[in-house]
A protein has these predicted regions:
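Amphipathic, charged alpha-helical segments and their helix-to-coil junctions
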Residues: 1-140
Length: 140
């Protein structure tokens, strides 16, 4: 068996991927915040001055506000999708490497099954924890 969660926590590649994903998320959050600030600024201007504006100006600003709301909503959806794509891009190679190494350890040691230990409620004394073997294969 192997506790994959424990293994992942120990991998420098995962720490690096976590860091890159956090940076990416922070960049997205900054862009989102700038859109919201722009909207709030224009809305405040509209609320404070609309009574003195011409109908054409008021309608123009209302259209701008509506477009900004749509842009904010679209960006939020797109950023969630982009974040998920980035996460897969960063973690899939790591997970594929782990799978390959698990297979290698299994074949080398003639194991018929390797279970994920993070979900096991009981492990008998005959069970083999392959964590040391995996760490060696992954260079941890």
């Amino acid at each position: 068996y192997l506790n994959t969660n424990e293994l992942l926590v120990q991998m420098k590649e995962v720490k690096s991927a976590d860091s890159l994903l956090n940076q990416y998320a922070e960049e997205m959050q900054k862009i989102y915040a700038s859109y919201v600030m722009e909207y709030q600024s224009k809305l405040a201007d509209y609320q404070n001055n609309a009574a003195t504006w011409s109908e054409v100006k008021r309608e123009s600003v209302e259209t701008d506000l509506g477009n900004l709301q749509i842009r904010i909503s679209d960006f939020e959806k797109e950023s969630n999708q982009k974040l998920e794509t980035k996460k897969q891009e960063l973690y899939n190679p790591i997970l594929e490497d782990i799978k390959a190494k698990i297979k290698l350890v299994g074949e080398e040691n003639k194991f018929t099954t390797i279970l994920d230990g993070s979900a096991m409620l009981y492990v008998g004394t005959d069970a083999v924890d392959i964590m040391p073997m995996m760490k060696k294969k992954l260079g941890i």
